[in-house]
Amino acid sequence: MSSILVVTCLLTTIGLYFYNNPLSHGRWFMMRRFINWFPLGMTYAFLYMGRYNLNVCKNALGSLMTKEDFGLIFAAGTVTYALSFLVNGPLVDRIGGKKGIIIAAIGSSLANIVLGVLTYLVVTEQLKIKLVLAFSIVYAVNMYFQSYGAVSIIKVKAYWFHVRERGVFGAIFGTLISFGVYFAFDWGQAIVDMTKANLPSGETGWAQRAMQHLFASNVKPVDATWAVFFIPAAALLVWALLDWFFIKDTPEECDFPPFDTHDASSGQMHVKLSTMDLLKMVFTSRLMLIIAAIEFTSGVLRNGIMQWYTVFAHEVKQPGAEFFLGHWGLLLCIFGIIGGFAGGLISDKCFTSRRGPPAALLCGFMFVMAVLMAVFLKSNPFIVGSAAVLISMAVIGVHSLMSGTAAADFGGRKATATCSGLIDGFVYLGTGLQSFSLGYLTTRSWLWWPIFLIPFAAIGCVAAVVMWHELPAATRRYLNLIERKPEPFDPDPMSETPELEGVS
Protein backbone atom coordinates (compact mmCIF):
# COMPACT_ATOMS: atom_id res chain seq x y z
CA MET A 1 0.00 0.00 0.00
CA SER A 2 2.76 2.46 0.90
CA SER A 3 4.52 1.80 -2.42
CA ILE A 4 1.31 2.60 -4.30
CA LEU A 5 1.00 5.90 -2.42
CA VAL A 6 4.61 6.82 -3.20
CA VAL A 7 4.19 5.99 -6.90
CA THR A 8 0.98 8.06 -6.92
CA CYS A 9 2.85 10.99 -5.37
CA LEU A 10 5.61 10.66 -7.98
CA LEU A 11 3.13 10.62 -10.87
CA THR A 12 1.27 13.59 -9.36
CA THR A 13 4.53 15.53 -9.09
CA ILE A 14 5.36 14.80 -12.73
CA GLY A 15 1.83 15.84 -13.75
CA LEU A 16 2.10 19.12 -11.84
CA TYR A 17 5.45 19.80 -13.52
CA PHE A 18 3.91 19.53 -16.99
CA TYR A 19 0.79 21.44 -15.91
CA ASN A 20 2.78 24.38 -14.52
CA ASN A 21 4.07 26.16 -17.61
CA PRO A 22 3.70 29.92 -16.96
CA LEU A 23 6.16 30.86 -19.72
CA SER A 24 4.38 28.68 -22.33
CA HIS A 25 7.45 26.61 -23.23
CA GLY A 26 7.19 24.30 -26.22
CA ARG A 27 6.32 20.64 -25.70
CA TRP A 28 9.81 19.37 -26.58
CA PHE A 29 11.47 21.83 -24.18
CA MET A 30 9.23 20.65 -21.35
CA MET A 31 9.90 16.99 -22.20
CA ARG A 32 13.67 17.46 -22.54
CA ARG A 33 13.78 19.37 -19.26
CA PHE A 34 11.93 16.48 -17.62
CA ILE A 35 14.43 13.99 -19.07
CA ASN A 36 17.09 16.20 -17.49
CA TRP A 37 15.72 16.68 -13.97
CA PHE A 38 14.20 13.25 -13.40
CA PRO A 39 17.41 11.17 -13.35
CA LEU A 40 19.19 14.05 -11.62
CA GLY A 41 16.48 14.13 -8.97
CA MET A 42 16.31 10.37 -8.48
CA THR A 43 20.07 10.30 -7.98
CA TYR A 44 19.61 12.91 -5.28
CA ALA A 45 16.86 10.83 -3.66
CA PHE A 46 19.15 7.79 -3.49
CA LEU A 47 21.92 9.98 -2.11
CA TYR A 48 19.53 10.65 0.76
CA MET A 49 19.04 6.90 1.16
CA GLY A 50 22.82 6.54 1.36
CA ARG A 51 22.93 9.32 3.96
CA TYR A 52 20.13 8.51 6.40
CA ASN A 53 20.61 4.73 6.29
CA LEU A 54 22.86 5.42 9.27
CA ASN A 55 19.71 6.12 11.33
CA VAL A 56 18.21 2.75 10.42
CA CYS A 57 21.53 1.03 11.09
CA LYS A 58 21.75 2.63 14.55
CA ASN A 59 18.38 1.21 15.61
CA ALA A 60 19.29 -2.23 14.21
CA LEU A 61 22.70 -2.38 15.91
CA GLY A 62 21.31 -1.69 19.38
CA SER A 63 24.03 -1.50 22.03
CA LEU A 64 26.82 -1.60 19.44
CA MET A 65 25.98 2.05 18.68
CA THR A 66 24.70 4.16 21.58
CA LYS A 67 22.78 7.44 21.23
CA GLU A 68 25.92 9.41 22.01
CA ASP A 69 27.94 7.36 19.49
CA PHE A 70 25.29 8.01 16.86
CA GLY A 71 25.26 11.72 17.67
CA LEU A 72 29.06 11.92 17.30
CA ILE A 73 29.13 9.95 14.03
CA PHE A 74 26.31 11.98 12.50
CA ALA A 75 27.85 15.24 13.69
CA ALA A 76 31.23 14.33 12.16
CA GLY A 77 29.49 13.82 8.83
CA THR A 78 27.37 16.94 8.99
CA VAL A 79 30.24 19.25 9.95
CA THR A 80 32.27 17.80 7.05
CA TYR A 81 29.31 18.41 4.74
CA ALA A 82 28.94 21.97 5.99
CA LEU A 83 32.58 22.90 5.35
CA SER A 84 32.85 21.11 2.00
CA PHE A 85 31.09 23.90 0.12
CA LEU A 86 34.31 25.95 0.26
CA VAL A 87 35.71 23.42 -2.22
CA ASN A 88 32.81 21.95 -4.12
CA GLY A 89 30.66 25.07 -4.55
CA PRO A 90 33.17 26.98 -6.70
CA LEU A 91 34.24 23.69 -8.32
CA VAL A 92 30.72 22.80 -9.48
CA ASP A 93 30.25 26.38 -10.72
CA ARG A 94 33.21 25.64 -13.00
CA ILE A 95 32.69 22.01 -14.05
CA GLY A 96 28.87 22.03 -14.14
CA GLY A 97 26.17 20.13 -12.32
CA LYS A 98 26.34 16.99 -14.48
CA LYS A 99 29.89 16.16 -13.44
CA GLY A 100 29.10 17.23 -9.89
CA ILE A 101 26.19 14.79 -9.45
CA ILE A 102 28.23 11.94 -10.92
CA ILE A 103 31.07 12.67 -8.45
CA ALA A 104 28.48 12.65 -5.65
CA ALA A 105 26.93 9.34 -6.69
CA ILE A 106 30.17 7.43 -7.25
CA GLY A 107 31.90 8.81 -4.15
CA SER A 108 28.94 8.15 -1.86
CA SER A 109 28.51 4.68 -3.32
CA LEU A 110 32.10 3.76 -2.50
CA ALA A 111 31.80 5.20 1.02
CA ASN A 112 28.62 3.19 1.63
CA ILE A 113 30.38 0.03 0.51
CA VAL A 114 33.11 0.68 3.09
CA LEU A 115 30.47 1.32 5.79
CA GLY A 116 28.83 -1.97 4.86
CA VAL A 117 32.13 -3.86 5.06
CA LEU A 118 32.89 -2.29 8.46
CA THR A 119 29.45 -3.25 9.77
CA TYR A 120 29.90 -6.81 8.52
CA LEU A 121 33.32 -7.22 10.13
CA VAL A 122 32.22 -5.79 13.48
CA VAL A 123 28.87 -7.61 13.71
CA THR A 124 30.47 -10.97 12.81
CA GLU A 125 33.23 -10.23 15.36
CA GLN A 126 36.02 -10.47 12.80
CA LEU A 127 37.15 -6.95 13.72
CA LYS A 128 37.44 -5.86 17.34
CA ILE A 129 37.00 -2.07 17.30
CA LYS A 130 34.52 0.47 18.58
CA LEU A 131 32.30 1.59 15.74
CA VAL A 132 32.31 5.26 16.67
CA LEU A 133 35.81 6.20 15.42
CA ALA A 134 35.81 4.13 12.23
CA PHE A 135 32.25 5.10 11.34
CA SER A 136 32.92 8.78 12.04
CA ILE A 137 35.81 8.83 9.56
CA VAL A 138 34.08 6.91 6.77
CA TYR A 139 30.74 8.67 7.28
CA ALA A 140 32.56 12.01 7.03
CA VAL A 141 33.99 10.87 3.67
CA ASN A 142 30.48 9.84 2.59
CA MET A 143 29.13 13.25 3.54
CA TYR A 144 31.91 15.04 1.65
CA PHE A 145 30.75 13.38 -1.56
CA GLN A 146 27.10 13.79 -0.57
CA SER A 147 27.69 17.53 -0.42
CA TYR A 148 28.14 17.61 -4.21
CA GLY A 149 24.53 16.53 -4.68
CA ALA A 150 22.50 19.60 -3.74
CA VAL A 151 24.84 22.12 -5.38
CA SER A 152 24.79 20.07 -8.59
CA ILE A 153 21.03 19.72 -8.86
CA ILE A 154 20.55 23.44 -8.16
CA LYS A 155 23.31 24.37 -10.63
CA VAL A 156 21.55 22.51 -13.44
CA LYS A 157 18.15 23.87 -12.36
CA ALA A 158 19.42 27.45 -12.56
CA TYR A 159 19.94 27.18 -16.33
CA TRP A 160 16.73 25.31 -17.13
CA PHE A 161 14.12 27.08 -14.93
CA HIS A 162 13.05 30.72 -15.05
CA VAL A 163 12.74 32.54 -11.72
CA ARG A 164 8.94 32.52 -12.11
CA GLU A 165 9.05 28.71 -12.39
CA ARG A 166 11.51 28.02 -9.60
CA GLY A 167 9.04 27.99 -6.74
CA VAL A 168 7.43 24.93 -8.28
CA PHE A 169 10.83 23.43 -9.01
CA GLY A 170 11.66 24.06 -5.37
CA ALA A 171 8.59 21.95 -4.63
CA ILE A 172 9.96 19.24 -6.92
CA PHE A 173 13.27 19.53 -5.06
CA GLY A 174 11.42 19.02 -1.78
CA THR A 175 9.58 16.06 -3.29
CA LEU A 176 12.86 14.40 -4.25
CA ILE A 177 14.16 14.92 -0.72
CA SER A 178 10.97 13.33 0.59
CA PHE A 179 11.39 10.29 -1.66
CA GLY A 180 14.95 9.94 -0.40
CA VAL A 181 13.78 10.03 3.21
CA TYR A 182 11.17 7.38 2.40
CA PHE A 183 13.82 5.21 0.74
CA ALA A 184 16.12 5.61 3.74
CA PHE A 185 13.63 4.97 6.53
CA ASP A 186 10.97 2.65 5.10
CA TRP A 187 12.98 0.78 2.47
CA GLY A 188 15.95 0.78 4.83
CA GLN A 189 13.87 -0.74 7.63
CA ALA A 190 12.41 -3.27 5.20
CA ILE A 191 15.96 -4.27 4.21
CA VAL A 192 16.90 -4.70 7.88
CA ASP A 193 13.76 -6.78 8.53
CA MET A 194 14.33 -9.03 5.51
CA THR A 195 17.95 -9.72 6.44
CA LYS A 196 17.33 -10.84 10.02
CA ALA A 197 19.09 -14.09 10.83
CA ASN A 198 16.15 -15.97 12.35
CA LEU A 199 13.03 -15.21 10.36
CA PRO A 200 10.13 -17.62 11.04
CA SER A 201 9.87 -20.08 8.15
CA GLY A 202 6.31 -19.02 7.36
CA GLU A 203 7.38 -15.37 6.85
CA THR A 204 10.06 -15.94 4.20
CA GLY A 205 8.88 -14.98 0.74
CA TRP A 206 10.99 -14.80 -2.40
CA ALA A 207 12.28 -11.31 -1.52
CA GLN A 208 13.45 -12.41 1.93
CA ARG A 209 15.08 -15.53 0.51
CA ALA A 210 16.89 -13.47 -2.13
CA MET A 211 18.14 -10.99 0.48
CA GLN A 212 19.30 -13.82 2.73
CA HIS A 213 21.10 -15.46 -0.18
CA LEU A 214 22.84 -12.23 -1.16
CA PHE A 215 23.79 -10.85 2.24
CA ALA A 216 23.65 -13.56 4.94
CA SER A 217 26.95 -14.27 6.68
CA ASN A 218 28.66 -17.64 6.31
CA VAL A 219 30.81 -16.84 9.34
CA LYS A 220 28.15 -16.40 12.01
CA PRO A 221 24.32 -16.47 11.99
CA VAL A 222 23.68 -12.77 12.69
CA ASP A 223 21.40 -10.12 11.21
CA ALA A 224 22.83 -8.89 7.89
CA THR A 225 22.43 -5.20 8.79
CA TRP A 226 25.25 -4.32 6.37
CA ALA A 227 22.77 -4.73 3.48
CA VAL A 228 21.33 -1.31 4.36
CA PHE A 229 24.59 0.19 3.05
CA PHE A 230 25.25 -2.09 0.06
CA ILE A 231 21.85 -1.66 -1.62
CA PRO A 232 21.90 2.17 -1.92
CA ALA A 233 25.54 1.89 -3.02
CA ALA A 234 24.49 -0.28 -5.97
CA ALA A 235 21.53 1.99 -6.81
CA LEU A 236 23.77 5.07 -6.88
CA LEU A 237 26.10 3.47 -9.42
CA VAL A 238 23.14 2.74 -11.70
CA TRP A 239 21.87 6.32 -11.47
CA ALA A 240 25.38 7.71 -12.06
CA LEU A 241 25.44 5.83 -15.37
CA LEU A 242 22.00 7.17 -16.35
CA ASP A 243 23.10 10.70 -15.42
CA TRP A 244 26.06 10.40 -17.75
CA PHE A 245 23.77 9.62 -20.69
CA PHE A 246 20.81 11.94 -20.07
CA ILE A 247 21.81 15.11 -18.19
CA LYS A 248 22.75 18.30 -20.03
CA ASP A 249 23.97 21.31 -18.09
CA THR A 250 22.21 23.95 -20.21
CA PRO A 251 19.38 24.15 -22.79
CA GLU A 252 21.95 25.27 -25.37
CA GLU A 253 23.61 21.83 -25.15
CA CYS A 254 20.30 20.40 -26.42
CA ASP A 255 20.21 22.90 -29.32
CA PHE A 256 17.66 25.22 -27.71
CA PRO A 257 18.20 28.99 -28.05
CA PRO A 258 19.83 30.88 -25.12
CA PHE A 259 17.41 31.07 -22.20
CA ASP A 260 17.44 34.15 -19.93
CA THR A 261 16.12 33.07 -16.54
CA HIS A 262 16.01 36.67 -15.17
CA ASP A 263 17.95 35.81 -12.04
CA ALA A 264 20.87 37.75 -10.55
CA SER A 265 23.16 36.73 -13.45
CA SER A 266 20.87 38.23 -16.08
CA GLY A 267 22.99 40.51 -18.25
CA GLN A 268 26.14 39.36 -16.43
CA MET A 269 26.81 35.99 -18.06
CA HIS A 270 29.90 37.35 -19.81
CA VAL A 271 31.58 38.15 -16.48
CA LYS A 272 34.31 35.71 -15.48
CA LEU A 273 34.54 34.90 -11.78
CA SER A 274 37.47 33.34 -9.97
CA THR A 275 37.05 31.11 -6.93
CA MET A 276 37.90 34.04 -4.66
CA ASP A 277 35.38 36.24 -6.49
CA LEU A 278 32.68 33.64 -5.90
CA LEU A 279 33.50 33.23 -2.21
CA LYS A 280 33.70 37.01 -1.76
CA MET A 281 30.26 37.39 -3.36
CA VAL A 282 28.80 34.93 -0.90
CA PHE A 283 30.43 36.06 2.33
CA THR A 284 29.93 39.80 1.74
CA SER A 285 26.25 39.50 0.78
CA ARG A 286 23.95 40.46 3.63
CA LEU A 287 21.07 38.72 1.89
CA MET A 288 22.96 35.44 1.44
CA LEU A 289 23.86 35.48 5.12
CA ILE A 290 20.19 36.01 6.06
CA ILE A 291 19.20 33.04 3.89
CA ALA A 292 22.02 31.03 5.47
CA ALA A 293 20.70 31.91 8.94
CA ILE A 294 17.23 30.65 7.99
CA GLU A 295 18.74 27.44 6.69
CA PHE A 296 20.83 27.00 9.84
CA THR A 297 17.60 26.93 11.82
CA SER A 298 15.96 24.60 9.30
CA GLY A 299 18.89 22.20 9.69
CA VAL A 300 18.32 22.10 13.44
CA LEU A 301 14.57 21.53 13.01
CA ARG A 302 14.63 19.12 10.08
CA ASN A 303 17.11 16.67 11.54
CA GLY A 304 16.04 17.44 15.08
CA ILE A 305 12.73 15.81 14.17
CA MET A 306 13.60 13.35 11.40
CA GLN A 307 16.65 11.95 13.17
CA TRP A 308 15.34 11.80 16.74
CA TYR A 309 11.63 10.90 16.58
CA THR A 310 12.35 7.26 15.76
CA VAL A 311 14.95 7.07 18.54
CA PHE A 312 12.44 8.66 20.95
CA ALA A 313 9.62 6.32 19.94
CA HIS A 314 11.83 3.25 20.30
CA GLU A 315 12.98 4.36 23.74
CA VAL A 316 9.73 5.83 25.12
CA LYS A 317 6.71 3.74 24.15
CA GLN A 318 3.98 5.75 22.40
CA PRO A 319 0.64 4.03 23.09
CA GLY A 320 -1.96 4.95 20.50
CA ALA A 321 0.66 6.47 18.19
CA GLU A 322 2.46 3.35 16.94
CA PHE A 323 1.38 4.28 13.40
CA PHE A 324 3.93 7.12 13.28
CA LEU A 325 6.90 4.88 14.03
CA GLY A 326 5.65 2.08 11.79
CA HIS A 327 5.24 4.39 8.78
CA TRP A 328 7.75 7.14 9.57
CA GLY A 329 9.41 7.21 6.16
CA LEU A 330 6.10 7.21 4.31
CA LEU A 331 4.72 10.02 6.47
CA LEU A 332 7.86 12.12 5.94
CA CYS A 333 7.59 11.49 2.21
CA ILE A 334 3.92 12.44 1.80
CA PHE A 335 3.97 15.43 4.13
CA GLY A 336 7.34 16.59 2.78
CA ILE A 337 5.81 16.70 -0.70
CA ILE A 338 2.86 18.69 0.65
CA GLY A 339 5.23 21.12 2.39
CA GLY A 340 7.41 21.55 -0.67
CA PHE A 341 4.48 22.28 -2.98
CA ALA A 342 2.77 24.52 -0.43
CA GLY A 343 5.87 26.70 -0.09
CA GLY A 344 6.63 26.77 -3.82
CA LEU A 345 3.11 27.48 -5.02
CA ILE A 346 2.49 30.15 -2.37
CA SER A 347 5.76 31.82 -3.36
CA ASP A 348 5.12 31.82 -7.12
CA LYS A 349 1.36 32.35 -7.15
CA CYS A 350 0.74 34.61 -4.14
CA PHE A 351 3.99 36.53 -3.61
CA THR A 352 5.37 37.02 -7.18
CA SER A 353 8.20 34.53 -6.54
CA ARG A 354 9.36 36.19 -3.32
CA ARG A 355 10.74 33.46 -1.05
CA GLY A 356 10.65 35.25 2.30
CA PRO A 357 6.87 35.35 2.96
CA PRO A 358 6.12 31.60 2.74
CA ALA A 359 9.33 30.82 4.64
CA ALA A 360 8.22 33.14 7.47
CA LEU A 361 4.76 31.56 7.60
CA LEU A 362 6.20 28.05 7.69
CA CYS A 363 8.73 28.93 10.41
CA GLY A 364 5.96 30.43 12.53
CA PHE A 365 3.95 27.25 12.07
CA MET A 366 6.94 25.16 13.22
CA PHE A 367 7.26 27.31 16.33
CA VAL A 368 3.67 26.51 17.30
CA MET A 369 4.14 22.78 16.63
CA ALA A 370 7.36 22.61 18.67
CA VAL A 371 5.58 24.26 21.61
CA LEU A 372 2.79 21.66 21.33
CA MET A 373 5.38 18.88 21.41
CA ALA A 374 6.92 20.27 24.59
CA VAL A 375 3.53 20.64 26.29
CA PHE A 376 2.22 17.16 25.39
CA LEU A 377 5.46 15.14 25.25
CA LYS A 378 4.61 13.05 28.31
CA SER A 379 0.83 13.03 28.09
CA ASN A 380 -0.39 12.69 24.48
CA PRO A 381 1.70 10.57 22.05
CA PHE A 382 -0.69 11.24 19.16
CA ILE A 383 -0.25 15.02 19.38
CA VAL A 384 3.53 14.58 19.65
CA GLY A 385 3.64 12.36 16.56
CA SER A 386 1.32 14.66 14.59
CA ALA A 387 3.32 17.76 15.51
CA ALA A 388 6.57 16.02 14.54
CA VAL A 389 5.19 15.11 11.11
CA LEU A 390 3.84 18.65 10.57
CA ILE A 391 7.20 20.20 11.50
CA SER A 392 8.82 17.90 8.93
CA MET A 393 6.27 19.07 6.37
CA ALA A 394 6.95 22.75 7.03
CA VAL A 395 10.72 22.44 7.20
CA ILE A 396 10.89 20.78 3.77
CA GLY A 397 8.95 23.77 2.45
CA VAL A 398 11.48 26.17 3.98
CA HIS A 399 14.46 24.12 2.80
CA SER A 400 13.22 23.85 -0.78
CA LEU A 401 12.53 27.61 -0.86
CA MET A 402 15.91 28.62 0.53
CA SER A 403 18.47 26.04 -0.64
CA GLY A 404 16.49 24.90 -3.66
CA THR A 405 15.31 28.27 -4.94
CA ALA A 406 16.55 31.47 -3.25
CA ALA A 407 20.20 30.44 -3.69
CA ALA A 408 19.72 30.20 -7.45
CA ASP A 409 17.62 33.39 -7.62
CA PHE A 410 20.07 35.64 -5.79
CA GLY A 411 23.29 33.83 -6.67
CA GLY A 412 22.41 33.70 -10.35
CA ARG A 413 23.51 31.05 -12.81
CA LYS A 414 27.16 32.14 -12.51
CA ALA A 415 27.36 31.54 -8.75
CA THR A 416 24.50 29.15 -8.04
CA ALA A 417 26.62 26.27 -6.76
CA THR A 418 28.72 28.46 -4.48
CA CYS A 419 25.68 30.21 -3.02
CA SER A 420 23.64 27.04 -2.61
CA GLY A 421 26.74 25.38 -1.13
CA LEU A 422 26.99 28.10 1.52
CA ILE A 423 23.31 27.83 2.33
CA ASP A 424 23.27 24.03 2.36
CA GLY A 425 26.45 24.14 4.45
CA PHE A 426 24.61 26.12 7.10
CA VAL A 427 21.83 23.52 7.05
CA TYR A 428 24.39 20.94 8.08
CA LEU A 429 26.06 23.19 10.62
CA GLY A 430 22.62 23.34 12.22
CA THR A 431 22.32 19.59 11.84
CA GLY A 432 25.70 19.12 13.50
CA LEU A 433 24.72 21.42 16.37
CA GLN A 434 21.50 19.52 17.08
CA SER A 435 23.27 16.17 16.71
CA PHE A 436 25.90 17.05 19.32
CA SER A 437 23.38 18.80 21.57
CA LEU A 438 20.47 16.37 21.47
CA GLY A 439 22.77 13.36 21.68
CA TYR A 440 23.80 14.78 25.06
CA LEU A 441 20.54 16.38 26.25
CA THR A 442 18.25 13.43 25.51
CA THR A 443 20.34 11.17 27.74
CA ARG A 444 19.28 13.50 30.59
CA SER A 445 15.63 14.03 29.68
CA TRP A 446 13.61 13.78 26.47
CA LEU A 447 11.80 17.00 27.44
CA TRP A 448 14.90 18.90 26.30
CA TRP A 449 14.25 17.66 22.76
CA PRO A 450 11.33 19.97 21.78
CA ILE A 451 12.49 22.74 24.13
CA PHE A 452 15.80 22.84 22.23
CA LEU A 453 13.96 23.24 18.90
CA ILE A 454 11.60 26.10 19.88
CA PRO A 455 14.03 29.08 19.73
CA PHE A 456 15.39 28.02 16.34
CA ALA A 457 11.90 28.12 14.81
CA ALA A 458 11.48 31.66 16.19
CA ILE A 459 14.87 32.81 14.85
CA GLY A 460 14.06 31.39 11.40
CA CYS A 461 10.74 33.23 11.35
CA VAL A 462 12.34 36.58 12.22
CA ALA A 463 15.07 36.15 9.59
CA ALA A 464 12.50 35.27 6.91
CA VAL A 465 10.46 38.39 7.77
CA VAL A 466 13.61 40.50 7.26
CA MET A 467 13.84 39.30 3.62
CA TRP A 468 10.07 39.55 3.04
CA HIS A 469 10.28 41.97 0.08
CA GLU A 470 13.50 40.72 -1.54
CA LEU A 471 13.66 39.93 -5.26
CA PRO A 472 16.58 39.91 -7.72
CA ALA A 473 16.67 43.14 -9.71
CA ALA A 474 16.25 41.28 -13.02
CA THR A 475 13.16 39.49 -11.69
CA ARG A 476 11.70 42.80 -10.55
CA ARG A 477 12.26 44.26 -14.04
CA TYR A 478 10.67 41.18 -15.62
CA LEU A 479 7.59 41.54 -13.42
CA ASN A 480 7.28 45.24 -14.22
CA LEU A 481 7.84 45.00 -17.98
CA ILE A 482 6.53 41.57 -18.99
CA GLU A 483 3.90 40.55 -16.44
CA ARG A 484 2.90 44.14 -15.61
CA LYS A 485 3.06 43.41 -11.88
CA PRO A 486 4.84 46.42 -10.41
CA GLU A 487 6.53 45.82 -7.06
CA PRO A 488 5.61 48.69 -4.71
CA PHE A 489 8.74 48.39 -2.57
CA ASP A 490 12.20 49.52 -3.58
CA PRO A 491 14.58 46.57 -3.75
CA ASP A 492 17.17 46.17 -1.04
CA PRO A 493 20.61 47.05 -2.44
CA MET A 494 21.68 43.42 -1.96
CA SER A 495 19.03 42.22 -4.40
CA GLU A 496 20.78 44.19 -7.13
CA THR A 497 23.79 41.87 -6.68
CA PRO A 498 26.33 44.66 -7.26
CA GLU A 499 29.12 42.19 -6.48
CA LEU A 500 28.92 40.91 -10.04
CA GLU A 501 29.49 44.28 -11.59
CA GLY A 502 33.00 44.95 -12.71
CA VAL A 503 34.37 41.58 -11.62
CA SER A 504 36.67 40.06 -14.19
What are these regions (language model features)?
Residues 173-249:
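Helix-loop-helix hairpin linking two adjacent transmembrane segments in secondary transporters
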Residues 353-402:
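C-terminal transmembrane helical hairpin of 12-TM major facilitator-type secondary transporters
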Residues 106-128, 364-378:
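C-terminal ends and interior cores of transmembrane alpha-helices
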Residues 51-58, 185, 285-341, 399, ...:
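Extracytoplasmic gate region of multi-pass secondary transporters
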Residues 167-193, 335-336, 424-434:
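Glycine-rich segments within core transmembrane alpha-helices of 12-TM secondary carriers
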Residues 12-21, 233-260, 463-468:
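C-terminal membrane-cytosol helix-exit motif in multi-pass small-molecule transporters
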Residues 94-106, 348-363:
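Cytoplasmic membrane-interface "Motif A"-like loop-to-helix N-cap segments
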Residues 138-175:
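Cytoplasmic helix-loop-helix junction between adjacent transmembrane helices
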